[in-house]
Protein backbone atom coordinates (compact mmCIF):
# COMPACT_ATOMS: atom_id res chain seq x y z
CA UNK A 1 0.00 0.00 0.00
CA UNK A 2 1.41 3.37 -0.95
CA UNK A 3 1.69 5.74 1.96
CA UNK A 4 -0.61 8.77 1.80
CA UNK A 5 0.80 12.25 1.36
CA UNK A 6 2.28 13.85 4.48
CA UNK A 7 0.95 17.25 5.45
CA UNK A 8 1.77 18.04 9.06
CA UNK A 9 3.95 17.17 12.10
CA UNK A 10 4.27 14.34 14.61
CA UNK A 11 5.29 13.24 18.13
CA UNK A 12 6.02 9.86 19.59
CA UNK A 13 5.02 7.08 21.87
CA UNK A 14 6.64 4.30 23.71
CA UNK A 15 4.90 0.98 23.77
CA UNK A 16 4.70 -2.69 24.60
CA UNK A 17 7.34 -5.23 25.48
CA UNK A 18 8.64 -8.36 23.82
CA UNK A 19 10.50 -11.53 24.69
CA UNK A 20 13.90 -10.31 25.84
CA UNK A 21 15.55 -13.41 24.43
CA UNK A 22 15.39 -11.85 20.97
CA UNK A 23 17.42 -8.85 22.11
CA UNK A 24 21.17 -8.65 21.77
CA UNK A 25 22.67 -7.04 24.90
CA UNK A 26 24.89 -4.14 23.99
CA UNK A 27 27.75 -5.49 26.05
CA UNK A 28 27.97 -8.58 23.81
CA UNK A 29 28.12 -6.73 20.52
CA UNK A 30 31.73 -6.59 19.36
CA UNK A 31 30.73 -4.27 16.55
CA UNK A 32 29.67 -1.69 19.12
CA UNK A 33 32.87 -1.75 21.14
CA UNK A 34 34.83 0.75 19.06
CA UNK A 35 35.75 3.70 21.25
CA UNK A 36 34.86 6.22 18.52
CA UNK A 37 31.61 4.62 17.36
CA UNK A 38 28.34 6.43 17.94
CA UNK A 39 26.66 3.34 19.37
CA UNK A 40 29.62 2.55 21.61
CA UNK A 41 29.70 6.12 22.89
CA UNK A 42 26.05 6.05 23.87
CA UNK A 43 26.45 2.59 25.38
CA UNK A 44 29.23 3.99 27.57
CA UNK A 45 26.90 6.76 28.70
CA UNK A 46 24.12 4.26 29.40
CA UNK A 47 21.75 6.09 27.05
CA UNK A 48 21.18 3.32 24.49
CA UNK A 49 19.91 0.22 26.28
CA UNK A 50 19.02 -2.40 23.66
CA UNK A 51 18.90 -2.84 19.90
CA UNK A 52 16.32 -4.79 17.90
CA UNK A 53 16.30 -7.15 16.04
CA UNK A 54 19.25 -9.37 16.85
CA UNK A 55 19.68 -10.41 13.22
CA UNK A 56 21.73 -7.76 11.45
CA UNK A 57 22.51 -5.52 14.41
CA UNK A 58 26.01 -6.88 14.94
CA UNK A 59 27.20 -5.35 11.68
CA UNK A 60 24.40 -3.72 9.69
CA UNK A 61 23.16 -1.21 12.26
CA UNK A 62 26.63 0.13 13.17
CA UNK A 63 27.37 0.49 9.45
CA UNK A 64 24.21 2.54 8.95
CA UNK A 65 25.56 5.14 11.38
CA UNK A 66 29.09 5.21 9.93
CA UNK A 67 29.95 8.55 8.29
CA UNK A 68 32.17 6.71 5.85
CA UNK A 69 29.40 4.65 4.22
CA UNK A 70 26.93 5.43 1.45
CA UNK A 71 24.06 4.95 3.89
CA UNK A 72 25.03 8.07 5.85
CA UNK A 73 23.09 9.98 7.08
CA UNK A 74 20.24 7.92 8.48
CA UNK A 75 16.79 9.10 9.59
CA UNK A 76 15.61 8.15 13.08
CA UNK A 77 12.27 8.87 14.72
CA UNK A 78 10.77 8.83 18.17
CA UNK A 79 7.10 9.36 19.00
CA UNK A 80 5.41 11.34 21.75
CA UNK A 81 1.66 11.12 22.36
CA UNK A 82 -0.06 14.39 23.39
CA UNK A 83 -1.90 13.02 26.40
CA UNK A 84 -0.98 16.28 28.17
CA UNK A 85 -0.10 19.78 27.03
CA UNK A 86 3.55 19.49 28.04
CA UNK A 87 6.50 17.16 27.87
CA UNK A 88 7.92 15.99 31.19
CA UNK A 89 11.24 14.77 32.56
CA UNK A 90 10.30 11.21 31.64
CA UNK A 91 10.54 12.22 27.95
CA UNK A 92 14.00 13.75 28.22
CA UNK A 93 16.05 10.60 27.61
CA UNK A 94 14.29 9.91 24.32
CA UNK A 95 14.93 13.52 23.30
CA UNK A 96 18.56 13.29 24.40
CA UNK A 97 18.84 10.16 22.27
CA UNK A 98 17.52 12.06 19.24
CA UNK A 99 19.85 14.98 19.96
CA UNK A 100 22.93 12.74 20.19
CA UNK A 101 22.01 11.17 16.85
CA UNK A 102 21.46 14.62 15.35
CA UNK A 103 24.85 15.78 16.65
CA UNK A 104 26.42 12.80 14.87
CA UNK A 105 25.03 14.08 11.56
CA UNK A 106 21.82 12.07 11.27
CA UNK A 107 18.35 13.45 10.58
CA UNK A 108 15.85 12.97 13.39
CA UNK A 109 12.07 13.21 13.56
CA UNK A 110 10.00 13.89 16.67
CA UNK A 111 6.56 12.48 15.92
CA UNK A 112 3.59 13.93 17.78
CA UNK A 113 0.84 11.30 18.00
CA UNK A 114 -2.10 13.57 17.32
CA UNK A 115 -4.05 10.56 16.02
CA UNK A 116 -2.76 7.72 18.19
CA UNK A 117 -3.25 9.65 21.43
CA UNK A 118 -6.98 9.25 20.95
CA UNK A 119 -6.57 5.48 21.31
CA UNK A 120 -4.12 5.42 24.21
CA UNK A 121 -0.91 3.42 24.42
CA UNK A 122 -1.46 0.46 26.79
CA UNK A 123 2.26 -0.21 27.28
CA UNK A 124 3.31 -0.27 30.90
CA UNK A 125 -0.22 0.53 32.11
CA UNK A 126 -2.44 -1.50 34.40
CA UNK A 127 -5.66 0.17 33.26
CA UNK A 128 -7.02 2.05 30.27
CA UNK A 129 -6.21 5.73 29.84
CA UNK A 130 -9.00 8.21 30.28
CA UNK A 131 -10.35 9.09 26.84
CA UNK A 132 -9.46 12.58 25.59
CA UNK A 133 -11.77 14.75 23.53
CA UNK A 134 -10.63 15.53 20.00
CA UNK A 135 -10.15 19.25 20.65
CA UNK A 136 -8.13 18.55 23.77
CA UNK A 137 -5.82 16.23 21.82
CA UNK A 138 -5.39 18.86 19.11
CA UNK A 139 -4.57 21.55 21.67
CA UNK A 140 -2.12 19.23 23.41
CA UNK A 141 -0.50 18.36 20.09
CA UNK A 142 0.02 22.04 19.28
CA UNK A 143 1.55 22.60 22.71
CA UNK A 144 3.89 19.63 22.34
CA UNK A 145 5.01 20.79 18.94
CA UNK A 146 5.93 24.19 20.39
CA UNK A 147 7.71 22.49 23.29
CA UNK A 148 9.72 20.23 21.02
CA UNK A 149 10.67 23.10 18.75
CA UNK A 150 11.79 25.19 21.75
CA UNK A 151 13.97 22.36 23.06
CA UNK A 152 15.48 21.81 19.61
CA UNK A 153 16.22 25.55 19.34
CA UNK A 154 17.93 25.63 22.75
CA UNK A 155 19.96 22.58 21.77
CA UNK A 156 21.00 24.19 18.49
CA UNK A 157 21.89 27.56 20.00
CA UNK A 158 23.47 26.62 23.33
CA UNK A 159 25.15 23.25 22.85
CA UNK A 160 26.98 23.49 19.52
CA UNK A 161 30.15 21.41 19.26
CA UNK A 162 31.65 22.42 15.91
CA UNK A 163 30.36 19.39 14.01
CA UNK A 164 27.92 19.38 11.11
CA UNK A 165 24.59 18.30 12.56
CA UNK A 166 21.62 16.65 10.93
CA UNK A 167 18.11 18.10 10.84
CA UNK A 168 15.44 18.04 13.56
CA UNK A 169 11.87 17.80 12.24
CA UNK A 170 8.59 17.77 14.15
CA UNK A 171 5.66 15.92 12.52
CA UNK A 172 2.15 14.89 13.59
CA UNK A 173 0.67 11.55 12.56
CA UNK A 174 -2.81 13.03 12.30
CA UNK A 175 -1.59 14.33 8.94
CA UNK A 176 -1.75 10.87 7.40
CA UNK A 177 -4.67 9.44 9.35
CA UNK A 178 -7.24 12.21 8.99
CA UNK A 179 -8.09 11.24 5.39
CA UNK A 180 -8.03 7.50 5.99
CA UNK A 181 -11.27 5.53 5.83
CA UNK A 182 -11.48 2.72 8.37
CA UNK A 183 -12.54 -0.04 5.96
CA UNK A 184 -9.92 0.97 3.37
CA UNK A 185 -7.22 1.09 6.03
CA UNK A 186 -8.11 -2.32 7.47
CA UNK A 187 -8.30 -3.86 4.02
CA UNK A 188 -4.88 -2.53 3.05
CA UNK A 189 -3.05 -2.92 6.36
CA UNK A 190 -4.91 -5.42 8.53
CA UNK A 191 -4.05 -8.47 6.47
CA UNK A 192 -0.36 -8.05 7.24
CA UNK A 193 -0.83 -8.51 11.00
CA UNK A 194 -1.38 -11.89 12.67
CA UNK A 195 -3.63 -11.97 15.73
CA UNK A 196 -1.50 -14.58 17.47
CA UNK A 197 1.56 -12.37 17.23
CA UNK A 198 -0.24 -9.26 18.44
CA UNK A 199 -1.81 -11.15 21.33
CA UNK A 200 1.56 -12.56 22.39
CA UNK A 201 3.00 -9.15 23.32
CA UNK A 202 3.73 -8.99 27.03
CA UNK A 203 1.94 -5.65 27.41
CA UNK A 204 -1.19 -7.17 25.85
CA UNK A 205 -0.99 -10.33 27.94
CA UNK A 206 -0.70 -8.37 31.18
CA UNK A 207 -3.77 -6.33 30.35
CA UNK A 208 -5.85 -9.27 29.17
CA UNK A 209 -5.19 -11.04 32.47
CA UNK A 210 -6.11 -7.97 34.51
CA UNK A 211 -9.64 -7.45 35.91
CA UNK A 212 -10.15 -4.47 33.63
CA UNK A 213 -9.03 -6.20 30.45
CA UNK A 214 -8.15 -4.29 27.28
CA UNK A 215 -10.27 -2.31 24.85
CA UNK A 216 -10.16 -2.79 21.08
CA UNK A 217 -8.89 0.79 20.72
CA UNK A 218 -5.88 0.08 22.93
CA UNK A 219 -5.24 -3.25 21.23
CA UNK A 220 -5.19 -1.54 17.84
CA UNK A 221 -2.62 1.02 19.02
CA UNK A 222 0.37 -1.16 18.10
CA UNK A 223 -0.98 -1.48 14.55
CA UNK A 224 -1.09 2.29 14.11
CA UNK A 225 2.38 2.74 15.56
CA UNK A 226 3.66 0.09 13.17
CA UNK A 227 2.03 1.98 10.30
CA UNK A 228 3.68 5.21 11.48
CA UNK A 229 7.06 3.53 11.17
CA UNK A 230 6.15 2.24 7.71
CA UNK A 231 4.94 5.65 6.59
CA UNK A 232 8.12 7.38 7.77
CA UNK A 233 10.18 4.62 6.14
CA UNK A 234 8.42 5.19 2.80
CA UNK A 235 8.31 8.98 2.99
CA UNK A 236 11.61 9.81 4.70
CA UNK A 237 13.69 6.65 4.43
CA UNK A 238 13.47 6.28 8.22
CA UNK A 239 14.98 2.95 9.22
CA UNK A 240 15.39 3.35 12.97
CA UNK A 241 12.83 3.93 15.72
CA UNK A 242 13.94 5.18 19.13
CA UNK A 243 11.81 4.65 22.20
CA UNK A 244 11.68 3.80 25.87
CA UNK A 245 12.42 0.26 26.93
CA UNK A 246 8.67 -0.30 27.37
CA UNK A 247 8.21 0.22 23.62
CA UNK A 248 9.85 -2.96 22.39
CA UNK A 249 6.56 -4.62 21.48
CA UNK A 250 5.46 -1.69 19.33
CA UNK A 251 8.88 -1.47 17.68
CA UNK A 252 8.71 -5.18 16.91
CA UNK A 253 5.29 -4.76 15.28
CA UNK A 254 6.69 -2.03 13.04
CA UNK A 255 9.69 -4.14 12.10
CA UNK A 256 7.52 -7.11 11.13
CA UNK A 257 5.07 -4.95 9.15
CA UNK A 258 7.77 -3.18 7.14
CA UNK A 259 9.67 -6.40 6.51
CA UNK A 260 6.53 -8.13 5.18
CA UNK A 261 5.63 -5.26 2.85
CA UNK A 262 9.08 -4.31 1.58
CA UNK A 263 11.51 -7.08 2.48
CA UNK A 264 13.71 -4.42 4.08
CA UNK A 265 15.14 -4.51 7.57
CA UNK A 266 14.53 -1.70 10.02
CA UNK A 267 15.78 -1.33 13.57
CA UNK A 268 14.86 -0.23 17.05
CA UNK A 269 16.93 1.40 19.77
CA UNK A 270 15.65 1.73 23.32
CA UNK A 271 16.61 4.10 26.09
CA UNK A 272 16.18 3.27 29.78
CA UNK A 273 13.15 4.41 31.72
CA UNK A 274 13.79 6.83 34.56
CA UNK A 275 12.03 5.95 37.78
CA UNK A 276 11.35 7.75 41.04
CA UNK A 277 12.91 6.70 44.35
CA UNK A 278 9.92 4.38 44.82
CA UNK A 279 10.53 2.69 41.46
CA UNK A 280 7.59 4.30 39.63
CA UNK A 281 8.19 5.49 36.07
CA UNK A 282 8.36 9.27 35.94
CA UNK A 283 5.35 10.52 34.04
CA UNK A 284 1.96 12.16 34.13
CA UNK A 285 0.07 8.93 34.81
CA UNK A 286 2.19 8.11 37.85
CA UNK A 287 1.33 11.47 39.37
CA UNK A 288 4.97 12.47 39.80
CA UNK A 289 5.60 14.42 36.62
CA UNK A 290 8.16 17.21 36.51
CA UNK A 291 6.98 19.18 33.48
CA UNK A 292 9.14 20.91 30.86
CA UNK A 293 6.60 23.71 30.35
CA UNK A 294 7.34 26.73 32.55
CA UNK A 295 3.65 27.29 33.26
CA UNK A 296 3.44 23.84 34.91
CA UNK A 297 6.92 23.48 36.45
CA UNK A 298 9.06 26.59 36.84
CA UNK A 299 12.77 26.65 35.89
CA UNK A 300 13.51 26.88 39.64
CA UNK A 301 11.49 23.73 40.36
CA UNK A 302 13.15 21.83 37.51
CA UNK A 303 16.57 22.99 38.71
CA UNK A 304 15.84 21.92 42.28
CA UNK A 305 14.55 18.52 41.11
CA UNK A 306 18.02 17.72 39.78
CA UNK A 307 19.91 19.47 42.61
CA UNK A 308 18.13 17.14 45.03
CA UNK A 309 19.28 13.95 43.28
CA UNK A 310 21.24 11.64 45.63
CA UNK A 311 24.93 10.94 45.26
CA UNK A 312 24.31 7.38 44.12
CA UNK A 313 22.36 8.63 41.06
CA UNK A 314 24.10 11.83 40.04
CA UNK A 315 26.99 10.36 38.02
CA UNK A 316 24.60 8.22 35.99
CA UNK A 317 22.32 11.21 35.43
CA UNK A 318 25.23 13.39 34.27
CA UNK A 319 25.93 10.77 31.60
CA UNK A 320 22.28 10.41 30.61
CA UNK A 321 20.93 13.97 30.77
CA UNK A 322 23.90 16.08 29.61
CA UNK A 323 26.28 16.36 26.67
CA UNK A 324 29.33 16.64 28.95
CA UNK A 325 32.26 14.47 27.83
CA UNK A 326 32.86 11.44 30.02
CA UNK A 327 36.34 12.62 31.13
CA UNK A 328 34.79 15.88 32.34
CA UNK A 329 32.14 13.95 34.27
CA UNK A 330 34.91 11.85 35.86
CA UNK A 331 36.68 15.06 36.92
CA UNK A 332 33.46 16.49 38.41
CA UNK A 333 32.97 13.32 40.44
CA UNK A 334 36.58 13.37 41.66
CA UNK A 335 36.10 16.90 42.97
CA UNK A 336 32.89 15.76 44.63
CA UNK A 337 34.79 13.15 46.66
CA UNK A 338 36.95 15.94 48.10
CA UNK A 339 34.11 18.38 48.78
CA UNK A 340 30.81 16.48 48.89
CA UNK A 341 29.09 19.25 50.83
CA UNK A 342 29.29 21.56 47.80
CA UNK A 343 27.06 19.19 45.75
CA UNK A 344 29.01 20.13 42.65
CA UNK A 345 27.75 17.27 40.42
CA UNK A 346 24.12 17.95 41.31
CA UNK A 347 24.46 21.66 40.58
CA UNK A 348 26.16 21.01 37.24
CA UNK A 349 23.50 18.46 36.31
CA UNK A 350 20.72 20.89 37.23
CA UNK A 351 22.36 23.70 35.28
CA UNK A 352 22.84 21.66 32.11
CA UNK A 353 19.28 20.31 32.06
CA UNK A 354 17.66 23.65 32.94
CA UNK A 355 19.63 25.40 30.20
CA UNK A 356 18.52 22.81 27.64
CA UNK A 357 14.87 23.03 28.67
CA UNK A 358 14.48 26.74 29.45
CA UNK A 359 17.50 28.38 27.83
CA UNK A 360 20.12 30.56 29.44
CA UNK A 361 17.48 32.98 30.73
CA UNK A 362 15.63 30.14 32.45
CA UNK A 363 18.83 28.94 34.10
CA UNK A 364 19.59 32.46 35.35
CA UNK A 365 16.05 32.64 36.74
CA UNK A 366 16.46 29.32 38.55
CA UNK A 367 19.71 30.49 40.13
CA UNK A 368 18.18 33.80 41.23
CA UNK A 369 15.27 32.00 42.84
CA UNK A 370 17.67 29.61 44.57
CA UNK A 371 19.69 32.49 46.01
CA UNK A 372 16.56 34.35 47.09
CA UNK A 373 14.91 31.39 48.81
CA UNK A 374 17.78 29.38 50.27
CA UNK A 375 20.44 32.05 50.80
CA UNK A 376 18.22 35.03 51.75
CA UNK A 377 19.88 37.09 49.02
CA UNK A 378 18.53 40.63 48.81
CA UNK A 379 20.48 41.16 45.58
CA UNK A 380 18.66 38.22 44.01
CA UNK A 381 15.28 39.35 45.33
CA UNK A 382 15.49 42.86 43.96
CA UNK A 383 16.20 41.77 40.39
CA UNK A 384 13.49 39.10 40.32
CA UNK A 385 10.50 39.63 38.06
CA UNK A 386 6.88 39.37 39.18
CA UNK A 387 6.68 36.06 37.32
CA UNK A 388 9.70 34.63 39.13
CA UNK A 389 8.33 35.60 42.53
CA UNK A 390 4.98 34.02 41.71
CA UNK A 391 6.75 30.86 40.53
CA UNK A 392 8.96 30.74 43.59
CA UNK A 393 6.18 31.37 46.10
CA UNK A 394 3.33 29.63 44.32
CA UNK A 395 1.02 29.58 47.30
CA UNK A 396 1.79 33.15 48.33
CA UNK A 397 -0.98 35.76 47.91
CA UNK A 398 0.03 38.51 45.46
CA UNK A 399 -1.23 42.05 46.12
CA UNK A 400 -0.78 45.41 44.41
CA UNK A 401 -0.90 48.59 46.53
CA UNK A 402 -0.22 52.29 46.10
CA UNK A 403 2.41 53.54 48.55
CA UNK A 404 0.87 56.25 50.71
CA UNK A 405 3.20 58.59 52.62
CA UNK A 406 3.93 57.27 56.09
CA UNK A 407 2.87 53.68 55.37
CA UNK A 408 4.14 51.56 58.26
CA UNK A 409 5.08 47.92 58.70
CA UNK A 410 1.82 47.37 60.58
CA UNK A 411 -0.22 49.06 57.82
CA UNK A 412 1.43 46.88 55.19
CA UNK A 413 0.89 43.61 57.05
CA UNK A 414 -2.77 44.40 57.66
CA UNK A 415 -3.45 45.55 54.07
CA UNK A 416 -1.98 42.26 52.87
CA UNK A 417 -4.14 40.33 55.37
CA UNK A 418 -0.91 38.80 56.62
CA UNK A 419 -1.65 39.28 60.33
CA UNK A 420 -4.84 39.35 62.39
CA UNK A 421 -6.37 42.64 63.49
CA UNK A 422 -5.91 43.94 67.02
CA UNK A 423 -3.25 43.27 69.64
CA UNK A 424 -2.43 39.77 68.40
CA UNK A 425 -1.21 41.00 65.03
CA UNK A 426 0.75 43.80 66.69
CA UNK A 427 2.48 41.29 68.97
CA UNK A 428 3.42 39.07 66.04
CA UNK A 429 5.60 41.91 64.79
CA UNK A 430 7.09 42.93 68.13
CA UNK A 431 7.91 39.32 68.99
CA UNK A 432 9.94 38.84 65.79
CA UNK A 433 7.46 36.82 63.76
CA UNK A 434 7.55 39.10 60.71
CA UNK A 435 10.29 39.79 58.17
CA UNK A 436 10.35 41.94 55.05
CA UNK A 437 12.76 40.97 52.28
CA UNK A 438 14.46 38.48 54.61
CA UNK A 439 15.09 41.17 57.25
CA UNK A 440 13.30 40.79 60.58
CA UNK A 441 11.18 43.80 61.61
CA UNK A 442 10.11 44.29 65.23
CA UNK A 443 8.76 47.86 65.26
CA UNK A 444 5.19 47.93 63.90
CA UNK A 445 5.31 51.73 63.53
CA UNK A 446 8.42 51.78 61.34
CA UNK A 447 7.73 53.62 58.07
CA UNK A 448 8.55 51.68 54.92
CA UNK A 449 11.82 52.75 53.30
CA UNK A 450 12.34 52.40 49.55
CA UNK A 451 15.52 50.40 49.01
CA UNK A 452 15.11 48.50 52.27
CA UNK A 453 11.51 47.43 52.76
CA UNK A 454 10.68 48.09 49.11
CA UNK A 455 13.18 46.75 46.60
CA UNK A 456 14.22 48.56 43.46
CA UNK A 457 11.92 46.32 41.42
CA UNK A 458 8.98 47.68 43.44
CA UNK A 459 8.40 44.46 45.37
CA UNK A 460 8.22 43.52 49.04
CA UNK A 461 8.33 39.95 50.29
CA UNK A 462 6.59 39.48 53.62
CA UNK A 463 7.28 36.37 55.65
CA UNK A 464 5.02 35.60 58.59
CA UNK A 465 6.28 32.86 60.86
CA UNK A 466 8.41 30.17 59.25
CA UNK A 467 6.71 29.51 55.93
CA UNK A 468 3.87 31.94 55.15
CA UNK A 469 4.82 34.35 52.38
CA UNK A 470 3.01 37.37 50.91
CA UNK A 471 4.14 39.26 47.81
CA UNK A 472 3.37 42.97 47.45
CA UNK A 473 3.83 44.97 44.26
CA UNK A 474 4.00 48.72 44.94
CA UNK A 475 2.54 50.93 42.21
CA UNK A 476 3.64 54.40 41.08
CA UNK A 477 6.66 54.70 43.35
Curated annotation (Swiss-Prot):
Q: Where does L-tyrosine bind?
A: 77, 121, 221, 225, 228, 247
The effect annotated for residue 200 to E is:
Loss of tRNA ligase activity
Signal peptide extent: none
Query: A Gene Ontology CC term for this entry?
Result: cytosol
* UniProt cross-references to PROSITE patterns, sorted A to Z: AA_TRNA_LIGASE_I
Residues binding ATP, per UniProt:
81, 244-246, 274, 284
Q: Which residues form a coiled coil?
A: none
Pfam assignment, any one: tRNA-synt_1b
| PANTHER family linked to this entry | TYROSINE--TRNA LIGASE, MITOCHONDRIAL (PTHR11766:SF0), TYROSYL-TRNA SYNTHETASE (PTHR11766)
Q: Which NCBIfam families match?
A: tyrS
Q: What functional role does this protein have?
A: Catalyzes the attachment of tyrosine to tRNA(Tyr) in a two-step reaction: tyrosine is first activated by ATP to form Tyr-AMP and then transferred to the acceptor end of tRNA(Tyr).
Q: How does it assemble?
A: Homodimer.
Protein name (database record): Tyrosine--tRNA ligase, mitochondrial
Q: Which source organism?
A: Homo sapiens
Amino acid sequence: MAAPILRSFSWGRWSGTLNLSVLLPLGLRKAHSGAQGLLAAQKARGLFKDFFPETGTKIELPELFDRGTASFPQTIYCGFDPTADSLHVGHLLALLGLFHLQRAGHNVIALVGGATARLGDPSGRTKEREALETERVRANARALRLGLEALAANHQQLFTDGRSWGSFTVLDNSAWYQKQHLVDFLAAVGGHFRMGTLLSRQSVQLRLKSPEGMSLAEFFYQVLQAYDFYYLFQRYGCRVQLGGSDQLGNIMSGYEFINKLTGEDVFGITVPLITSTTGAKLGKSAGNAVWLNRDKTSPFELYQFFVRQPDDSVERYLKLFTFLPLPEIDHIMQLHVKEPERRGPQKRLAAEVTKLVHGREGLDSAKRCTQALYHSSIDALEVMSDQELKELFKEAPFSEFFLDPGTSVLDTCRKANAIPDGPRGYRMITEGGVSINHQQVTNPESVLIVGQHILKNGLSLLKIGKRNFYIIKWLQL
